[in-house]
Each structure stands twice: as structure tokens, then as C-alpha cells.
């Protein structure tokens, strides 16, 4: 693994080339995927991703480069390529960078890391969830259950002296089912997701109840009558609906979109952009919640950001 002093030298090389801002993002991520198709385990898939990303900013121009060669020499070469892409001509006087290491509280503590758990234990929870879904009193025509876990270690450093790390662990079980009765069938999927380690499965009732509820809910939808044309309120439930907010508002509020004035929200702070009923909060500090962490991917501590309040940006 690259050393802190080597990271400092890479960042200093960026400044010496005249680059205004440089940020290094190191990642070492392990993933496991175990698919179960119609009660049959399809094998265990393990993946490890290790590398570094380099983000450079010069005025309103920016480039992102990456490599799986996490060495000082490879990163120095990446900096030179980035400077060429930014078409930087003038070099700057050598300036020393002091990297100050900071650590922050992680709102999602882990008890059982995925690497500490045998594949057989992971397979067992898959089969238990499968069995629970099939015993829910619903005619399940087909059922696939997938187990996933991720253990991501990150290190972020930049030319402003930031140096920090985080470890993010998630565990997920995805269920895909088709419930049927004769020619009437309905297919759906849902995720049992926890921002934790394998302790997510300590309470067997929790994930087996999830499995039963998922197929029962699918059967209720299958047997539901058609709705008559009418005007109804739009209600966004907790969970996956957060993706709708992310796509409709999140990207438009990103710094790059604002800087390039390509967002509909440019110069709209303090103005009405939505209904009075809309309040949008981005909170990465909620304990045990998926998406919470100690830091974001720029190395800043997570916080509660009110993006839209009562319709006002």
C-alpha cells in the first residue's frame, strides 16, 4: 500500500505543475455475491477492486483519471497526463503540503465483517429466506434470492491538506419472485438491505418476515382491481423513492453542474422551486441507515443538509 509521504509527494507534484487543486481517492473493496435460483445455489462470486482516482481542477475545467497501479510512480505519471489534458503551460513554484490526518465517527458500526463469515453461513440465510417466502401461503411460481456484501476501505487526500479514511460495510439480500394463480401472474423484487455486517442476520425473524411479506404484497397487487381514472395525491414512500429525488434534484445540485451553469437551480437559492409540501433533506449521519458514513467521497464529514425547505431552495 502506498505510504502517506508518497501521497504527499504526488500531490506536491500536481501543485508544481501549476494545477490549482488535486484530490486522490484510494479504494480497496471486496464484494461477495451468492445467487440462489429456485433453491439451487449457483456458486459463490468474489470480487476485489483496488485502485486510485485522481481528480484535478483548473478554473472551471476538470479531469478525472484512474489506475489500478497504486504506486507513487504510477500516480506521478497520472498527474502528468492530467496536466496535459488540462493544457497547463506554466509551472508553479514548489510548495510543501502538510497532510493532517483526521478521523470521524462512523454512524454505522460493524460487529461482524463479511470476511469473518463463512460462505456456508451466508448460504444458510439465503435458503432460510427462500423457505420462508415459499411457506407464506402464496402460490410462488418462481423465486430467486441473491446474497450480496461489500466491504469498502477508502482513503482521501488533497492539496488543501486533507487526509482521512473510512470503512463502509453493507449487506443485502435481493428477492425476485413471481406469484401466480392460473393465468394471473405478477412479478416483483425487493431488497433487504442493511448498512452493517453479517449481524444483519442475527435476528432470523427480521429477514424471514421480510421474505414472507414480499410475496404476500406481490399477491395483493396481483389480485387488486383496476383503478378508475381520477386525480390522486402523489406520495413518495421511504426507501427506493429516494432515487427519484436523487435523479430529479441531486445531480442538478452538484457543484460541477452549478459551476458550469447547466443546472435549473442556478441562482435560485431563496426562491420557490417546488410545492410548499416539499422539503428535501440529504442526511448522511443517520445511524445504521444505508448511505450513512463517516465521510463523503471528497473526505468531508457527513452532515444533515436541507436542500429544499417548504418548497424554497
What residues fall within each predicted segment?
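Active-site bordering "gate/hinge" segments
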Residues: 1-304, 309-312
Amino acid at each position: 500500500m502506498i505510504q502517506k509521504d508518497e501521497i504527499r509527494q504526488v500531490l506536491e507534484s500536481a501543485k508544481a505543475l501549476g494545477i490549482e487543486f488535486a484530490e486522490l481517492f484510494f479504494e480497496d473493496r471486496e464484494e461477495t455475491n451468492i445467487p440462489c435460483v429456485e433453491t439451487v445455489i449457483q456458486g459463490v462470486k468474489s470480487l476485489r477492486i483496488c485502485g486510485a482516482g485522481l481528480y484535478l481542477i483548473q478554473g472551471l475545467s476538470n479531469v478525472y483519471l484512474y489506475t489500478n497501479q497504486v504506486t507513487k510512480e504510477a500516480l506521478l505519471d497520472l498527474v502528468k497526463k492530467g496536466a496535459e489534458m488540462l493544457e497547463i503551460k506554466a509551472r508553479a513554484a514548489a510548495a510543501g503540503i502538510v497532510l493532517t490526518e483526521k478521523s470521524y465517527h462512523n454512524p454505522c458500526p460493524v460487529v461482524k465483517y463479511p470476511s469473518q463469515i463463512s460462505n456456508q453461513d451466508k448460504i444458510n440465510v439465503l435458503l432460510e429466506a427462500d423457505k420462508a417466502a415459499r411457506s407464506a401461503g402464496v402460490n410462488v411460481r418462481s423465486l430467486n434470492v441473491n446474497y450480496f456484501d461489500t466491504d469498502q476501505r477508502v482513503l482521501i487526500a488533497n492539496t488543501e491538506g486533507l487526509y482521512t479514511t473510512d470503512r463502509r460495510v453493507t449487506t443485502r439480500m435481493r428477492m425476485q419472485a413471481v406469484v401466480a394463480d392460473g393465468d394471473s401472474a405478477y412479478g416483483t423484487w425487493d431488497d433487504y438491505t442493511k448498512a452493517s455486517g453479517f449481524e444483519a442476520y442475527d435476528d432470523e425473524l427480521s429477514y424471514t418476515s421480510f421474505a414472507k411479506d414480499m410475496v404476500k404484497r406481490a399477491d395483493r397487487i396481483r389480485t387488486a382491481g383496476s383503478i378508475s381514472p381520477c386525480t390522486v395525491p402523489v406520495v413518495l414512500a421511504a426507501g427506493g423513492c429516494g432515487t427519484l429525488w436523487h435523479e430529479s434534484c441531486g445531480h442538478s445540485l452538484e457543484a460541477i453542474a452549478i459551476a458550469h451553469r447547466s443546472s435549473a437551480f442556478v441562482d435560485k437559492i431563496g426562491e420557490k422551486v417546488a410545492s410548499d409540501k416539499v422539503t428535501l433533506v440529504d442526511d448522511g449521519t443517520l445511524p445504521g441507515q444505508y448511505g450513512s458514513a463517516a465521510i463523503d467521497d471528497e473526505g468531508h464529514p457527513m452532515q444533515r443538509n436541507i436542500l429544499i425547505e417548504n418548497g424554497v431552495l
